[in-house]
């Protein structure tokens, strides 16, 4: 390791710090807060099917509610998978956060716009829009999420990727970024894989 071990610090604690510092450097070296300015601030989720967007949407809502005193509204814009709406509803109930959906609508752009109107009317200062999973090669689906972005002008667009995707995540992230110009990457399921192929897009771009 080549590190001087301080006598007042346990070797195990020093190891944790070394790993933390290395991971911080790998992920870009700086901590950047999510932009939650606005009435409401809007965060748009994007990513492949099964990447963990819905679960992360709930976790993000809970974190911003408890640590930033935000009043979030979760929005179900996956009009293709009814189970996704139910999953988001259950998560919303568990964290005591309201959820907006339109069961009979097949227009995610309209749903997202109506949700923002609902947030303004009821005083919610944060809207988290959960969208359907999609492949970058599916032109129709990519046009759809681009239309959602254009309609709601989100503060942040997050690309959610399963860390078990491996190096394929690099190409997928680049393809999504070309269409959406996203602001950040969320790595999910980090406890389930050791390959570490999906890494910070900031790191990837710096080493192209």
Model-found features: residue ranges?
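Primarily NTPase-proximal linker/entry elements flanking Walker-type ATP/GTP-binding cores
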Residues: 1-77, 84-105, 111-129
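Short beta-alpha junctions and helix-cap segments that line functional grooves
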Residues: 31, 60, 144, 171-173, ...
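Short glycine-/polar-rich loops that comprise or flank the Walker A/P-loop
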Residues: 69-70, 152-156, 180-183
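G-domain G4 guanine-recognition motif of GTPases
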Residues: 77, 132, 161-164, 186-193
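Inter-motif core of Ras-like GTPase G domains
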Residues: 143-162
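Active-site/ligand-binding-proximal alpha/beta "capping" segment
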Residues: 149, 169, 173-183
